[in-house]
UniProtKB/Swiss-Prot annotation:
One of its GO terms (molecular function) is nickel cation binding. Transmembrane segments: none annotated. The gene is ureD. This is Urease accessory protein UreD. It is found in: Cytoplasm. GO terms for cellular component: cytoplasm. The keyword Lyase does not apply. HAMAP family: UreD (MF_01384).
């Protein structure tokens, strides 16, 4: 399968500091130079050099975080998927976390416009004592008729393996031809967000405290969370605006950083 963009990147710890040990990219995918907003932790910005994803695009990203290394990754801006009359856009991401490593992978929202079809497949392999923070936000794009869900469909599959055992399979399927406003769908909301944590300290006590932190959020929003096998927690959010979901995920991320990593919240410095 010919790819529109490819990114392969590895991070390793050297002299008490994480460095980017190898990096290869081609096509429409680029990556910024590492920015050390924290002394030992490189922050990377994934960059798409085109105006958005279009018909038949295929993107492949491979990230490897070596033993005891720490890496934070985000995007430069939202991912925009435009009309796909012939073939859906496909985005595949493969992540490997070695023993004791930490990856914070928090991307900007996905915006799907009228006629868009999008397949997202993310596979994560986690080794012992590693930590993984992940977010995903899906929002409807603008349509000239004012419809709330102009895209054709979205398929998002997230698989997490710990020691080669499948501990999470999250399959999110959104198809506006169905009643998206009904129960077991979006329940009257338009935007959906996910925040995922895997960390050895993410136990029931942490889950309860995180719930209290989220419950204090005063806005028109619905959310739920549950524990997962192998010290994991998943948070799902429904809202009517991107900003509300981003604020909730930011709060959850800051709380998790403080409680699990002993670090302050992070400002990604996007303008």
């Amino acid at each position: 399968m010919k790819c529109t963009g490819v990114l392969q990147l590895s991070a390793a710890k050297k002299r008490q500091k994480t460095i980017i040990s190898s990096c290869y990219h081609e096509g429409a995918l680029k990556v910024s130079r590492p920015i050390y907003l924290e002394k030992d932790l490189p922050f990377l910005y994934l960059i798409h050099v085109g105006g958005g994803y279009v018909d038949g695009d295929v993107y492949l990203t491979n990230l490897d975080v070596e033993e005891e290394a720490e890496l934070a990754v985000t995007t430069q801006s939202a991912t925009k998927v435009y009309k796909t009359p012939k073939k859906p856009v496909v985005q595949q991401t493969n992540i490997h976390l070695k023993k004791g490593s930490v990856l914070e992978y928090l991307l900007d929202p996905l915006i799907s416009y009228k006629g868009a079809r999008f397949i997202q497949e993310t596979t994560v392999h986690i080794e012992e004592d590693s930590g993984f923070f992940y977010s995903d936000v899906i929002t409807p794009g603008w349509a000239e008729d004012g419809s709330l869900f102009p895209y054709d469909w979205i398929r998002s599959k997230l698989k997490v393996y710990k020691k080669d055992r499948l501990v999470l399979f999250d399959h999110l399927r959104l198809e506006p031809d169905e009643d998206m406003s009904g129960m077991l769908q979006m329940d009257g909301y338009t935007h959906i967000g996910t925040f995922l944590i895997f960390h050895q300290k993410a136990d029931k006590t942490f889950l309860d405290r995180l719930y209290d932190e989220m419950e204090a959020f005063d806005s028109d929003v619905r959310f739920g969370m549950t524990s997962l096998p192998a010290s994991g927690i998943i948070l799902r959010i429904l809202a009517r605006s991107t900003g509300i979901i981003e604020n909730m995920i930011s709060r959850a991320h800051s709380f998790a950083r403080r409680e699990l990593l002993g670090k302050n919240g992070v400002t990604w410095r996007k303008y």
